[in-house]
């Protein structure tokens, strides 16, 4: 019996020792992995700072690419006698795909925070499109001693010493909480940095650049005489802004700069260029506009009252118009694929949904079409804005005028949201319309695309029914733009 107890005791002792050994090994592995992560990022920042000390080369900016402008086609009122019994297929030879959006950039390693006592962490409170935000910053923030490459490298090293980890972490948290797209995130970083330094000086620009870089974004820094600039790389070709082409990427200055600047061409690990997709609207503090009532002329029950968020409209006003894959038609898909805010959806969709309830799909689309055709006042962009400008759906509900682009974008958004029907944009030189894929074959002009029949719906052909093409549209030059 005593021998049995002895054996059991030995086994238990071995098990305890084995468990302790395993736990110690696991902890050692964790510490080693953490050290590897930290050394990887630390070394990346060390290499970057060292590269910054080298000579910054002069580069000449490429001239801005103007936004393409066609001679606009004025709206045309529909006459009943124009309705034809025969269907006409619109032959589309070119289809513009919508490139799949990529996930937002991430830091090269997870940002891990150690608890910080209050004296170490201060709060930077700032207004971002009238939305109150705050992030932790060190009590004593860094200041550059000069405006040269050595000072900038020294400043980069100081920012990378660990004191700004909480700042970076909080900024990334705000990106998630406010649903900020890449463009919105960059603007937020700049607003925070200038607030922290109470100035748009070189200190603020370096902090903004460091945070943007550490968040995973592709950027370069430039010196314009003694003024530091952030250059952001974009997957999109941005209109009306000069740029610097470096290693096949276009870089744009966050703030205006001269055409000849010195650039540090150092690249950071796993950097990713900005995307200008707005897959989710920024969740900003709501600042309601005045109530606007919109009503269909033919279907008086299609009537809504809406208040848009001025803060969101103000953000959209900063959005740079751009194209993808050297195709200017891709710009409209970026606007059309942006969702309406939840607040606006809750204001207009219940009323519209109630009015189309019980109707056939064609009748429902026809009422939505007439609503967009007649509830908005048409005006040329040149007259209102001095040049072409497309609206996000939210903007069309805010501004008093809307042209063919704005109407088609809004119509496509409403039909996809309320009826869950596929919609494409149809481009004619000087004009933009839409086509809807109905569950049944409907009468009217149509296009065949990906095995589906899309029936023409033109929100600027005033009073026209589903299936009617505006007169004088050259179908041989029409192109289809796919939407999500």
Where are these regions (language model features)?
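Long, contiguous, compositionally biased segments that the model treats as domain-scale units
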Residues: 27-30, 34-212
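Extended, non-transmembrane interaction/recognition domains
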Residues: 207-208, 212-353
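Boundary of Sec targeting at the N-terminus
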Residues: 19-20
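Hydrophobic/aromatic-rich core segments of domains that either
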Residues: 219-251, 352, 357-359, 406-484
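Positively charged n-region of N-terminal signal peptides that target proteins for export
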Residues: 1-4
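Secondary-structure boundary elements
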Residues: 135, 139-143, 148-189, 333-398, ...
């Amino acid at each position: 019996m005593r021998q049995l107890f002895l054996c059991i005791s030995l086994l238990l002792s071995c098990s305890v020792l084995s468990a302790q050994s395993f736990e110690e090994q696991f902890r050692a592995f964790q510490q080693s992995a953490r050290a590897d992560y930290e050394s990887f990022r630390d070394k990346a920042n060390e290499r970057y700072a060292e590269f910054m000390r080298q000579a910054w080369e002069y580069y000449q900016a490429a001239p801005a690419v103007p936004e393409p402008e066609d001679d606009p086609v004025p709206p045309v009122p529909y006459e009943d006698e124009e309705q034809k019994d025969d269907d006409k297929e619109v032959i589309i030879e070119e289809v513009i795909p919508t490139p799949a959006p990529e996930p937002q950039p991430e830091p090269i390693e997870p940002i891990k925070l150690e608890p910080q006592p209050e004296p170490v962490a201060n709060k930077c409170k700032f207004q971002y499109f009238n939305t109150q935000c705050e992030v932790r910053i060190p009590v004593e923030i860094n200041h550059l001693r000069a405006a040269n490459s050595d000072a900038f490298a020294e400043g980069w090293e100081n920012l990378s010493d660990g004191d700004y980890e909480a700042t970076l972490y909080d900024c990334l948290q705000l990106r998630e909480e406010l649903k900020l797209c890449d463009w919105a995130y960059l603007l937020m970083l700049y607003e925070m940095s200038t607030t922290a330094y109470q100035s748009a000086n070189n200190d603020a620009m370096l902090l903004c650049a460091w945070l943007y870089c550490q968040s995973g974004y592709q950027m370069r820094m430039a010196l314009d005489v003694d003024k530091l600039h952030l250059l952001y790389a974009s997957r999109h070709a941005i209109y009306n802004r000069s740029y610097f082409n470096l290693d096949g990427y276009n870089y744009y200055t966050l703030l205006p700069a001269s055409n000849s600047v010195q650039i540090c061409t150092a690249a950071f690990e796993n950097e990713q260029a900005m995307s200008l997709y707005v897959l989710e609207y920024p969740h900003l503090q709501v600042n309601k506009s005045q109530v606007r009532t919109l009503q269909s002329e033919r279907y008086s029950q299609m009537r809504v009252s809406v208040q848009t968020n001025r803060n969101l409209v103000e953000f959209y006003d900063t959005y740079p118009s751009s194209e993808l894959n050297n195709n200017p038609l891709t710009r409209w898909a970026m606007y059309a694929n942006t969702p309406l805010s939840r607040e606006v959806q809750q204001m207009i969709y219940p009323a519209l949904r109630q009015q189309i309830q019980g109707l056939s799909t064609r009748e429902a689309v026809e009422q939505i079409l007439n609503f967009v055709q007649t509830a908005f006042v048409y005006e040329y962009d040149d007259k209102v804005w001095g040049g072409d400008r497309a609206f996000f759906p939210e903007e069309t509900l805010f501004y008093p005028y809307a042209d063919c682009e704005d109407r088609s974008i809004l119509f496509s958004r409403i039909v996809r949201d309320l009826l869950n029907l596929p919609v494409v944009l149809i481009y004619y030189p000087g004009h933009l319309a839409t086509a809807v894929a109905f569950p049944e074959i409907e009468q009217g002009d149509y296009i065949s695309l990906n095995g589906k029949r899309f029936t023409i719906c033109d929100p600027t052909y005033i009073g026209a029914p589903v299936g009617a093409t505006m007169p004088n549209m050259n179908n041989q030059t029409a192109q289809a733009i796919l939407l999500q």
